[in-house]
């Protein structure tokens, strides 16, 4: 009798099965694309397709994007352009870099990012030349957490990110890539997003960067070497101590080209010094201080920056 009762209870008891599902599949959270390495021209062997194709190899060759999934294309307005640029620069200030460039908004990069967002495709776009790409998708349309999610990959204890390309922190590396000085982003609402496990992710936010980050190359011994995202600042080589020639000034730890910058140049015919005036060629400079009095206005700028908030 006890045996039959035990068997009956076992049959009626609920069955619990644990599935190994990707992050965000059941939770309705935001997900980010895999970020693969970018090779220096001619450095990686042509047969190394897995490392060069970014994340396209996760899907079959017949998997194509369907622009019919697009519900509405939303180009960032002037306020959002400033907010996106400010957020990137805010996180770039956090790393101890001696050569970190200030980011500026690029309408050209924004247009290419918007084109890919409009495909509602979670895979990385093709045909980019020296342009990095980060992708975010979520069930909700407020993408104010996108840049923080990308940056916080560095804090993943299971990743062990060393500020150079790794599969688990490629988005972070692109955000803090010191040589990058241009960013442009686009956002789209979709009926569905292809390439995301599960359903409900109907919003896509894409950012393009130039120059691109996540660079790797092959050493003389045939080993892959991931270039560090920035030069470490320490001792006498503090922040901005290694600013490039095209961004010689420093503001809150970021290298930038001030307006009406007078670069001294010497001539061989005399001992006098002449000056030339160079203007930045970027399309939007929301975070750039004035050439004069930048240090005096630092506290005021910080107060203004803290006022940026986004609701989409």
From Swiss-Prot:
GO biological process: negative regulation of BMP signaling pathway; negative regulation of DNA endoreduplication; negative regulation of multicellular organism growth; positive regulation of growth rate; regulation of mesodermal cell fate specification; reproductive process; sexual reproduction
CDD domains: CAP_euk
Gene Ontology cellular-component annotations: adherens junction; extracellular space; plasma membrane
Position of the signal peptide: 1-18
Keywords in alphabetical order: Glycoprotein, Signal
Start-end of Acidic residues biased regions: 285-305
Stretches with biased composition (Low complexity): 265-284
Keyword Signal attached: yes
Glycosylation sites per record: 142
Stretches assigned to coiled coil: none
SMART domains: SCP
Expression sites (tissue/organ): Expressed in hypodermal tissues.
Pfam families linked: CAP
Chain positions covered by the region annotation Disordered: 265-312
Domain (SCP) ranges: 87-209
Family according to the record: Belongs to the CRISP family.
Function noted in UniProt: Regulates body size morphogenesis, but does not affect male tail development.
Protein name from the UniProt record: Protein lon-1
Record gene name: lon-1
